A protein has these predicted regions:
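Mid-domain Rossmann-like dinucleotide-binding core that forms the NAD(H)/NADP(H) cofactor-binding site
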Residues: 1-68
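Residues in the short beta-alpha loop(s) of Rossmann-like NAD(P)-binding domains
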Residues: 47-48, 108, 132
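C-terminal hydrophobic helical "lid"/dimerization subdomain
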Residues: 90, 134, 138-184
Length: 184
C-alpha cells in the first residue's frame, strides 16, 4: 500500500502531512513504517484512548480522537484509511488536500459515498489495496526480525481460551493493543 501510494505523491514523503485513520494492527504498522520512511508530520486518529497513548509512545507521533477532533478540511497530503467505514471514508475525503493521495485499506463496512466532485475537481488520487505479494510478506517478516517496528510491546498475547474476551475488550476499547495474538 505504501509503495503504491508514494509513487502517486506529488511531493516526497518527508514534505507531506500524513494522516493514518485507525490505530489497529494495519494503522499501527503503517504509522511505524511511515515514520521509518521519513514521515515527519504524522497523525493517527483512533477512537480508543488507550490505543492513542500506545501510538504516541511507540510511533512517536501525534494522535487524535476523530469524534472530538475530526481532521480539518484539506489538512493532509496523504491519508491512509486503515478502518474502512463510511465515517472514516468521509474523514479521509475531508482531510485530503487538492492533489493529495488517499489509500483505502480497511474494509469495516460496505456503506460508502464518495464525493466524486471533490475527487475530480481537487485532482485527488484514490487508491485501494487488499492483499500483498509474497515479496511484501517476506520484507515484513524481515523488518519484524530486524526490529524495524520497535519492541512490539503494542502486541498483546493471550491464550486461545481468552479469545472471546479479547474480542469483547477490543470492541469496548478496554485494551491498548493494536493486535492481540491468541496462542494455544
Amino acid at each position: 500500500a505504501l509503495n503504491l501510494s508514494m509513487r502517486a505523491l506529488v511531493r516526497p514523503l518527508h514534505e507531506c502531512s500524513v494522516l493514518v485513520i485507525g490505530g489497529g494492527a494495519i494503522g499501527m504498522f503503517a504509522a511505524l513504517l511511515l515514520r521509518r520512511l521519513g514521515a515527519r508530520r504524522l497523525c493517527v486518529t483512533e477512537t480508543n484512548e488507550r490505543r492513542r497513548a500506545s501510538i504516541e509512545r511507540h510511533v512517536g507521533c501525534e494522535s487524535a480522537d476523530p469524534r472530538s477532533a475530526p481532521p480539518a478540511e484539506a489538512s493532509h497530503d496523504f491519508v491512509i484509511d486503515a478502518v474502512g467505514s463510511k465515517a472514516t471514508r468521509q474523514d479521509a475525503f475531508r482531510a485530503i488536500r487538492p492533489g493529495g493521495v488517499i489509500m483505502h485499506v480497511g474494509l469495516q463496512d460496505w456503506a460508502s459515498e464518495i464525493d466524486m466532485r471533490k475527487l475530480t475537481l481537487a485532482e485527488i488520487t484514490l487508491l485501494g489495496t487488499y492483499t500483498y505479494t509474497t515479496a511484501d510478506l517476506r520484507a515484513t517478516v524481515a523488518a519484524l526480525d530486524d526490529g524495524l517496528f520497535g519492541d512490539l510491546a503494542w502486541v498483546e498475547q493471550r491464550t486461545l481460551a481468552e479469545g472471546p474476551q479479547a474480542f469483547v475488550d477490543l470492541d469496548r476499547g478496554a485494551s491498548a493493543a493494536a493486535k492481540i495474538v491468541l496462542a494455544p
